[in-house]
Amino acid sequence: KAEKIEQKEDTVKYNVQAFKAPEDRVIEDVLKRMPGISVLDGGKILYKGKPVNLTIDGLDMLGGRYAIATKNISPDHIATVEILENHQVIKALKGLVPSDLTTLNLKLKASSRGVFLLSLGGGLGYGDDWNRDVEGAGMYFGHKSQHIVTAKTNDIGSDLRYELTDQSMPSDAVRNYSQAMMATPPDLNRERYYFNDSYSATTNNLVKTGKGITVVFNAGYFNTSDLRDSRNETSYMLPDSSVNRICESISNVIDEGRLYGDVSYKVNNEKVYIKTDARLLCESSDVLSDVNGINQDYASKSL
């Protein structure tokens, strides 16, 4: 019987099947149960409180957008989760320059390599209106290439932006609409008040063109519409015992869009390290506010 956890020098190996529960749908669900590993609400992974890089079979296809893997790959396809502490990712510097980097590697089962993997999920319900939660992902992990394609849509409060967020960058989950009057969010989990209509799609590709040479091309699209309402009422007791009430009612319609594309060329072997990146990021947002019957419109675009 395989051990649940094995450690050798700076490498810790977790047996996925030993931690997997019947209700676990994606590998992120299992990671949350592994000692020392934490998964934040936005999908960022920490090991002993430190951020990690994530690789699949030792290859870095996704960079900081690793939630595309952890929120889509079934634990049935992963044999072990490996934690590599003090990991020197530049092979030419290995043994010469120390590193405090931690890498989390998803080691695939042999049966999941070189075959096309497909996962589909969906739900449809009716309350005051129709609601949906539909998603699909296709994957291929071979010796010379890796590919993940995803498409998702929902209007049940599940925030798809986290999956497309670069976890190595400062969080952009809450935008600063400084020029717009915004409804005050309640002190609840976001999914409880996030009245959304969201769509996302990604394509992620890595190709090995030689020893230690990889080309990565990733692209993604995200769009969401969010409805918010708040009402505050403050009462003041005046000296003549009369009551003065001040009411503030704010309604928002928030539309956001994001389109990105990344291309990376990397040579990483015992003698040479070269990395070249090209990135494109387009973002747009439009906030329509109604404050006590007065309309405001705030729009921004960036490239």
How would you label these PLM feature ranges?
Residues 2-286:
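Membrane-proximal, glycine/serine-rich, low-complexity loop/turn segments characteristic
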